[in-house]
Amino acid sequence: VFTTMKTHKLLFVTLLGTVCISCGHPSHKTGSEKEALGKLLFHDTSLSEPPGQSCATCHASSKGFADEQARAISEGAVQGLFSQRNSMSVCYAAFVPELHYDDDNENYVGGLFWDGRSPSLQDQAGIPLLNPVEMGNRDKQMVAEKVKRTPYYNRIVQIYGETEHCLL
């Protein structure tokens, strides 16, 4: 059981890290491989519950990686269910600082989502996957199992290995 839980956690961390890299973070010698893998993850509609919704569904490249819909709220993976707000652009998400109070400006700076509820890109990347309205997965284990069934899972293992540096 411990090994299975560790593997699921590693899968989840790898997924989040790869998606973050694909959104514009500088990479090392395997950067292009990581970017290609991130693109696959970003567009994979099998990672939602029910299948059919990907990150790209709400963050369209044709709209600056923001929602294509011109309404205040977005429909999630389940038809007829809407989130509390529309999807913002993820175009510069890799460059947003962690949420903090700036004494000089006497204001909060950074954080992701419209309300800053996610302090970092790494934290933000997993939230839609587990949101019951957005991508509908019940837990990290469910996401990890789906990732293991993808045709690109072996690429994840080749790039990150099956270690702590891997997966969710």
Residue ranges and their predicted role:
Residues 1-36:
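N-terminal export/targeting leaders of redox proteins
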Residues 23-168:
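Periplasmic c-type cytochrome electron-transfer domains
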